[in-house]
UniProtKB/Swiss-Prot annotation:
The protein's name: Pirin-like protein YhaK
Subunit structure: Monomer.
Family per record: Belongs to the pirin family.
Organism annotation: Escherichia coli O157:H7
Keywords assigned by UniProt, alphabetized: Cytoplasm
Locations listed in the record: Cytoplasm
Gene coding for it: yhaK
Length: 233
């Protein structure tokens, strides 16, 4: 079953220095029916103005994945670690209790645009505090997984996350690990097909909940960039 969540249905924020779109309840935006999906707690697309920053703050025990779409960011923690990431890279922070984290748009004249996901972390798992990955702009790229398969970032949760880039008319098929998946369009138009021949059309910024499907096929109706988040738990 596919249930779409269009960009227009998402929460919105504009603070001047920050513009944001929230898939799930976040900050001032609250919907009791949308507190997350399985272990996916947050899925935001945010634009930080030139020179803007998120001041240091602590987090619940989550893995925070930032996919940089445009610009360059710097991340610091209270333990003295810091790393930079730019467009075409993904950065994973394995947050720790009592440690604060900040984010800064390094450019003085260019906005920073990124997708940010929070995933519940298994308390028994301890992974590297910071991991970075260059995105392969090919058809399919596994960018995060529980065991760091195929050179992907290693998560503290049973989640598989794919970065998808398709030309118009191309398709990609995914075998899913469990009953829940979330699909997020970054840009482009496409349709998703299930083995029950259910079809859903999505465009730039739209998302979709996928339930109880063994596999899913994506067909690009225009040049497409998207994320597929396979969430068995």
């Amino acid at each position: 079953m596919i249930t779409t969540r269009t960009a227009r249905q998402c929460g919105q924020a504009d603070y001047g220095w920050l513009q944001a779109r929230y898939t799930f309840s976040f900050g001032h935006y609250f919907d009791p029916k949308l507190l997350g999906y399985a272990s996916l707690r947050v899925l935001n697309q945010e634009v930080l103005a030139p020179g803007a920053a998120f001041q240091p703050r602590t987090y619940p025990k989550v893995d925070i994945l930032n996919v940089i779409l445009d610009g360059e960011a710097e991340y610091r923690d209270s333990e003295g670690n810091h790393v930079q990431a730019s467009a075409g890279e993904a950065l994973l922070l394995s947050t720790q209790p009592g440690v604060s984290y900040s984010e800064h748009n390094l450019s003085k004249d260019k906005p920073l645009t990124r997708m940010q996901l929070w995933l519940d972390a298994c308390p028994q798992r301890e992974n590297p505090l910071i991991q970075k990955l260059a995105l392969n702009m090919g058809k399919q790229h596994l960018i995060a997984s529980p065991e760091g398969a195929m050179g992907s970032l290693q998560l503290r949760q049973q989640v598989w996350l794919h970065h998808i880039v398709l030309d118009k008319g191309e398709s990609a098929n995914f075998q899913l690990h469990g009953p829940r998946t979330y699909l997020q369009s970054i840009h482009g138009k496409f349709h998703a097909l299930t083995h029950h021949e259910e079809k859903a059309a999505l465009t730039c910024g739209d998302g979709a909940f996928i339930r109880d499907e063994a596999n899913i096929t994506l067909v690009a109706d225009s040049p497409l960039r998207a994320l597929l988040i396979d969430l068995p738990v």
